[in-house]
Amino acid sequence: MYDNTDNNGTVRCSFCGKTQEEVKKIVAGPGVYICNECIDLCKEIIDEEFYDEAVRELTDVPKPQEILNVLNEYVIGQERAKRTLSVAVYNHYKRVNQSETAATQDDVELQKSNICLIGPTGSGKTFLAQTLAKTLNVPFAIADATSLTEAGYVGEDVENILLKLLQSADYNVERAEKGIIYIDEIDKIARKSENVSITRDVSGEGVQQALLKILEGTVASVPPQGGRKHPHQEFIQIDTTNVLFIVGGAFDGIETIVKNRLGEKTIGFGKTNSALNEEESIMQHIIPEDLLKFGLIPEFIGRLPVMAALDKLTNDDLVRILTEPKNALVKQYQKLLSLDDTKLEFEPEALKAIAAKAIERNTGARGLRSIIEEIMMDVMFDVPSDESIEKVIITKMAAEGTGKPTIIYNKKDKEAV
């Protein structure tokens, strides 16, 4: 460590010895000085250690049951899909750790198992992927397949998906290479028919072809500023071998393909589609051949070996979603009003009415918040300005839009409806 001052009284950095004139700023402590350059260096060292810790965290991958337990706290229903995802994610990161610690060339190389989620809008596909990434503390990015086009056409390149993941990892490449990418609306890039078309399909089969390499694992050149607008920028190299890709889509109409296939195979045994277990969704019987008939190319399907079907949420499921998860919507709005010292209660019939509205609008769980916002708008406007409001009760009539919430006052001996 350098002396703080010399014979001329010049202040020096205690770490690098530079004078006040040689640096931008020197910060004084009890008998110690440090310059801005040494502060920056210390920050870099600390950041690197934190990044190393974040990368090392994955060596202790939660078991499938532990992953399922976390999913159960946040996601209602979809039991089969949650179990499938728990096993697939555990196996993926076990494979990542094995590839890093493989000692000899005789070790069996484990192939990557990307995941395809099939289910209607609002059934929880995106939320499941987000919860998995949060549970594992890995970078997470969402992309929309409908915005992607082949290189050379107007639209987003597939490399832009990796840019979003890199940004989520604060541009730490090593962390990004162990992240999760969720590609939504994957069914929208299906071929229009099984037959190969001679016309160019720049947002369909062409995008599937463009995605093949990064799904399988390749070293991709990612433009840090977004590609086409900055053609002369330096590229960042990202290896996608250990990136877990989860794709999702509603696949409207695929149930007809499944029914036709099951019907053809059961006729010889005197069974019909109605002989299937009524409690089981037809979607649970999807196989890769059905995706092929829907319009995904064989090479693309081959890179999505794990398939999980999500059922359409029922009225009871939506009521549970409103109240049971850790961050349930009802709990969120109760918390909001509690900040204004006001209690909030939803009558059971009101919850059923809210769920019925979501089903009527065909929005699933995704539409629940907007419905509650409509119901709560006047309440959330009035409560902050009226300290006499003690409690708000959301009734069935209020939920249906035929009445107003019940207001209970603490100072005025009355009840307004």
Swiss-Prot record:
GO terms for molecular function: ATP binding; ATP hydrolysis activity; ATP-dependent protein folding chaperone; protein dimerization activity; unfolded protein binding; zinc ion binding. ATP binds at P120, T121, G122, S123, G124, K125, T126, F127. Signal peptide: none annotated. Belongs to the ClpX chaperone family. The lineage of its organism: Bacteria, Bacillati, Bacillota, Bacilli, Lactobacillales. One of its GO terms (biological process) is proteolysis involved in protein catabolic process. This is ATP-dependent Clp protease ATP-binding subunit ClpX. InterPro entries: AAA+_ATPase (IPR003593), ATP-dep_Clp_protease_ClpX (IPR050052), ATPase_AAA_core (IPR003959), Clp_ATPase_C (IPR019489), Clp_protease_ATP-bd_su_ClpX (IPR004487), ClpX_bact (IPR046425), P-loop_NTPase (IPR027417), Znf_CppX_C4 (IPR010603). ATP-dependent specificity component of the Clp protease. It directs the protease to specific substrates. Can perform chaperone functions in the absence of ClpP.
